[in-house]
């Protein structure tokens, strides 16, 4: 399994290396060979050769650098998405892919992969989050964002139990299109939500008949504990 960690040195704001470490460990438990290529500005990306492409959160300055460099891969990125390659984008990296993005306070053209535009919030939002996907699977994480997206036609999450919705409608968050998964959720996404990591592993391996379900007991207990604590804190508020 070949994984591309895009802009690994610029987009590792919230422990994104940890996300790929967890994913790699889960794959190895299934006796898969895993190769992670760490790519950044100056490297020549050949996105089609990868089974999964990952991009994490960026500081404002690093966002500007990546926004400029990533433009040349827009067509290739669109092709790999349509080819049903797996992609996971977390934090503000999802802002790169719309029609408009905000770079250092200015609205500029995005990569145009999706139709949404980025809108600034009145003030930065920070807080824990509990989101439900279309199958009512509950995801937990943290949000630290200065913007939202104006419209999402194919949301990943359709119920916001706790946290900030990703659109002005206040009902949806994230993007799920084919095998593209994008969300503002961080902290880190795959480490906190073990079941999603298991899902990715199954899909990357082609849902093999010999897939053996690992208990992931510690990860499951940590998830349950986090969720219980988040809900408890929500009631206290």
Model region roles, listed by residue range:
Residues 103-174:
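Pocket-forming structural segment of enzyme catalytic cores
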Residues 7, 146-148, 187-189:
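Glycine-rich beta-alpha junction loops
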Residues 1-79, 191-192, 198-237:
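N-terminal beta1-alpha1 cap of cysteine-dependent amidohydrolase-like domains
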Residues 58-135:
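Cysteine-nucleophile active-site neighborhood
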Residues 4, 140-145, 181-185:
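Active-site-proximal beta-strand elements of phosphoester/diester hydrolases
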Residues 52-56, 88, 182-184:
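Structural motif
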Residues 167-205:
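A glycine-centered loop/beta-turn motif at secondary-structure junctions
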